Amino acid sequence: MEMESTAASTRFHQPHMERKMSAMTCEIFNELRLEGKLCDVVIKVNGFEFNAHKNILCSCSSYFRALFTSGWNNTEKKVYNIPGISPDMMKLIIEYAYTRTVPITPDNVEKLLAAADQFNIMGIVRGCCEFLKSELCLDNCIGICKFTDYYYCPELRQKAYMFILHNFEEMVKVSAEFLELSVTELKDIIEKDELNVKQEDAVFEAILKWISHDPQNRKQHISVLLPKVRLALMHAEYFMNNVKMNDYVKDSEECKPVIINALKAMYDLNMNGPSNSDFTNPLTRPRLPYAILFAIGGWSGGSPTNAIEAYDARADRWVNVTCEEESPRAYHGAAYLKGYVYIIGGFDSVDYFNSVKRFDPVKKTWHQVAPMHSRRCYVSVTVLSNFIYAMGGFDGYVRLNTAERYEPETNQWTLIAPMHEQRSDASATTLYGKVYICGGFNGNECLFTAEVYNTESNQWTVIAPMRSRRSGIGVIAYGEHVYAVGGFDGANRLRSAEAYSPVANTWRTIPTMFNPRSNFGIEVVDDLLFVVGGFNGFTTTFNVECYDEKTDEWYDAHDMSIYRSALSCCVVPGLANVGEYAARRDNFTGLALRDEVKYSASTSTLPV
């Protein structure tokens, strides 16, 4: 476990540590300690002596309480030799007993945690654990996780282990610690449903990298590791060329039935479609998604709806997670920031809202937060640098060019510079530290104009116009471009889409969607751009499709359960309770996301 050593340190303060004496008393006793007055104990470590007061040491450590009060120790004893600790660490321990603060650095955190554990000083243990959480990175996550084998740090262990699972692909590329895992440790990691990999190829490649580090001693472990890969979810070409023909696999008798079972499972999936056994078979069971796409509210059946569905991209399945206590809302905005989903503005067929609600997806609770300065239906919402931006919209009387932003820490909305044009039914996103808003309706015509907001100068700048007028548009940052998708041009709902390059200040056309739509949800999940629901010119739709910029193609995804337009989508990554929003792995009847069974209109398979 290595951490970058810096001159700076974190001084941990434990305000909630149990206290036998007041802070004032501790401060007075610390002055007496430093002056060598009224000390009644000497702690001796490797020849170094530390004067102290028994009461102060007992107040923060059960170790010292037992040491000073046990029956076999003379209560009048003054000098105690303490083994198993360095003088530097004992100095920090004693200082903490008096001040309840301790400097924690990359250089001392391991020894300090060991010392705090030895003396049962939970305040320092918690401080070291918080420090190690903040230092987690691709290079040290395995080491930190293993470090917790020796000390009781359950929250740190969980954090480190989930970091490994969530960042597996990137970690494998750079971590020297990965190559030193035991076969059992590697098996335990790659068999987890929470392992965050978009394709199972990455798991197999990680196994090969691990074996290649010590091939003579590790090649026999292929028989233990291969069954933990969801082989039937691989692209067939990769499986045949890279897995079935791999020398380690071919040389292992134990792997032969695994390969046969995988081929059979792949065949069954292609010929017969999904079955109830998909999620019970370890070769076909999709991983849990790292990020959940929420589709919130909208207009359905002639009125607003409170419906919320969660999309599991790894299983290509929607899950109804509607909270019946929540009120219906349409033409609103949604944003995810710092653990919360915010629902902003909108309309319930009677009132135009300036209200904002915040949803905690872990606790599943709703709270009202500060309202906006203006009522905003058809509002455009995006997030940048810990602020939520709300722009334009319709207040029930006029289309707006005003804009404001929300800061969660202060629970306040602040007006920013107004846009150049009035825009309702526009859409916004952020890219490279700037806010982009495109299209919309100004009360007279659908717009093809677009603007960019600079937060440093608080100024809007007009950029190159889109190639089509688009109201009810979907705008999203994807890769290095701003994508403008669908909408209404004043005559028709659109299938067309285009991408803006901030560097060139130009728009280029991309392939059209399968279905025309306006007033739909748009988000990026697993490096795919999803469009969700909307209005096709005749009716609301539950249709969903996704675009891959690498293949420059659109693909069908699983339909929502509810026909709706005027919804809003947002993506929530890294949920601790992701299983509560994902398709159930223990009782599944839906369609697993597989290259072999997902087709575009041209019958091309989903991208690898």
From Swiss-Prot:
SUPFAM superfamilies: Kelch motif, POZ domain. Keywords: Cytoplasm, Differentiation, Kelch repeat, Phosphoprotein, Repeat, Spermatogenesis, Ubl conjugation pathway. Testis specific. The modification Phosphoserine is found at residue 501. Pfam families: BACK, Beta-prop_ATRN-LZTR1, BTB, Kelch_1. Pathway: Protein modification; protein ubiquitination. GO terms for biological process: cell morphogenesis; fertilization; homeostasis of number of cells within a tissue; male genitalia morphogenesis; male gonad development; protein ubiquitination; spermatid development. Gene3D superfamilies: 1.25.40.420, Kelch-type beta propeller, Potassium Channel Kv1.1, Chain A. It comes from the Eukaryota. This is Kelch-like protein 10. It comes from Mus musculus.
